[in-house]
């Protein structure tokens, strides 16, 4: 498993944000990472993330942290507008990759597209649900003990294109209920309910 280290400065910055968000150290936290620098083809529809957030709050006693990187404000905004769930949108705080490390390490689970933060979760031994569309899972087929890949087998996938030239079915045919099932399975197996 890869290792990541957190400096005192990075941890202090994350602690300040967690205090701002009023996240208690005893609360369970699920991180949602809806973006992908690679391109839109790796992004699960924000409307689906919005529905997933509602389902997670119905099923789990947890707080939801929405991580959004540079250029992902519109994705985060759509999720916030479409969801009835209580979601903490971190986009306005412009969390950089250094501070994202301790933020993800604080999460009890991460639900993400196939993008960099998934590897942070693996490095911190966190359960992670990866919604995978245009990429071949064989490229990252290591350290999957606490990882569930949710994907669709389609003739056009994996295409490895940043933008889908077709109808983006590799992502749009993965439904929130399916991702929820994967998350609930990982939660039961890995997250202490105490």
Give short role names for the model-derived ranges.
Residues 78-82, 87-91, 122-193:
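Nucleotide-sugar donor-binding patch of glycosyltransferase catalytic domains
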Residues 5-8, 95-99, 155-158:
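A short acidic, often aromatic-flanked loop/helix-cap motif at beta-alpha or helix-coil junctions
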Residues 46-133:
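Donor-binding and catalytic core of enzymes assembling or modifying cell-surface/extracellular glycoconjugates
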Residues 1-41, 190:
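Mid-sequence helix-capping/hinge segment at a functional interface
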Residues 40-41, 74-75, 120, 138-139:
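Glycine/Thr-rich phosphate-binding loops of Rossmann-like dinucleotide-binding domains
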Residues 41-45, 170:
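Short, solvent-exposed loop/turn segments at secondary-structure boundaries
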């Amino acid at each position: 498993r890869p290792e990541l280290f957190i400096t005192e400065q990075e941890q202090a910055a994350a602690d300040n944000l967690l205090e701002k968000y009023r996240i208690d150290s005893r609360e369970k936290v699920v991180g949602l990472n809806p973006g992908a620098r690679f391109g839109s083809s790796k992004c699960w529809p924000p409307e689906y993330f919005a529905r997933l957030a509602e389902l997670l709050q119905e099923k789990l006693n947890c707080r939801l942290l929405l991580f959004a990187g540079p250029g992902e404000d519109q994705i985060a905004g759509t999720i916030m507008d479409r969801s009835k769930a209580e979601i903490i949108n971190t986009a306005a705080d412009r969390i950089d990759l250094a501070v994202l490390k301790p933020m993800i390490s604080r999460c009890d689970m991460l639900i993400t597209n196939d993008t960099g933060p998934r590897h942070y979760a693996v490095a911190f031994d966190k359960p992670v649900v990866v919604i995978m569309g245009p990429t071949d899972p064989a490229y990252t087929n290591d350290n999957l003990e606490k990882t569930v890949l949710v994907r669709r087998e389609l003739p056009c996938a994996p295409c490895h294109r940043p933008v889908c030239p077709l109808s983006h079915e590799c992502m749009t045919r993965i439904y929130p209920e399916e991702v929820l099932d994967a998350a609930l399975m990982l939660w039961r197996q890995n997250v202490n309910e105490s």
